[in-house]
Amino acid sequence: MDVSDVTSRYNDRLRVTDYADAATNGLQVGPGDRSVERIAFAVDAAAATISDAVEWGADLLVVHHGVAWGGLDAVTGREYDRIAALVDGECALYAAHLPLDGHPELGNAAHVADVLGLTQRSPFGDHSGEQIGLQGQLPDPTSAPALSKSLAAALPTGDQPVQVLDVGPAELTDVAVVTGSGADWLREAEANGVDALVTGEGKGKLYHEAREAGVSVFLAGHYATETGGVRALEAVADDWGVETRFISHPTGL
């Protein structure tokens, strides 16, 4: 198996060409004909995760947040350092951003939905015609504090509490999920009649918008809500006869 084989398999599974994305989805760094025996997985292609991948001897690093956003006009500074570390370490880089957010089985939103036990799921979070989230029903009506505890227990939030804007119904049933920075989908949540929106991080105007919409919002951390997708890709690769390793590097954000 070489880098092109891995790239093709993930590209097809995630439908990477169907998404309008600021990120470059697919192979970002490295030759396609390099043999792959070890694949490392991480949320972010940062200096720390690249260093860990190279030290382990990874032939390929698979991430959610890569190094190419809207094209690369210049490769200098920290961008140069990251790419140089990959090239010098003979480690290719594959990234899947929005396609990994919204995949109904492998995606970040699907992982959070699994954590919450959501049933009757349907696509949510329209982004240029593709859906990057999910909505569904909780197994039982749940209070905001109880839902917050469930998220904190199941996601790698570290010492950071799940922030809760408890401005919706006292008992929550219908929940929408857009991981990472998903506060912009509050209006869609309101339009769909859900009781709560689970995402990673918010914006200053979110409190009043959520309060006026009557939709509770749970901010569980950008990193914490987006580990599930790359872990799912790791599980897929485990069946390919290669060594895999997840590099955990929580940001607390």
UniProtKB/Swiss-Prot annotation:
Positions that bind a divalent metal cation 2: H65, H222, E226
GO CC annotations, alphabetized: cytoplasm
Residue ranges of coiled coil: none
Gene3D superfamilies named among the record's database cross-references: NIF3 (NGG1p interacting factor 3)-like (3.40.1390.30)
Top-rank taxon, per record: Archaea
One GO MF term: metal ion binding
Residues annotated to bind a divalent metal cation 1: H64, D101, E226
Regions that span the bilayer: none
Record InterPro entries: DUF34/NIF3 (IPR002678), DUF34/NIF3_sf (IPR036069)
A Pfam family this chain is assigned to: DUF34_NIF3
Keywords: Metal-binding
Family: Belongs to the GTP cyclohydrolase I type 2/NIF3 family.
Assembly and binders: Homohexamer.
NCBIfam families referenced in this protein's UniProt entry, alphabetically: YbgI_SA1388 (TIGR00486)
Listed name of the protein: GTP cyclohydrolase 1 type 2 homolog
Organism of this sequence: Halobacterium salinarum (strain ATCC 700922 / JCM 11081 / NRC-1) (Halobacterium halobium)
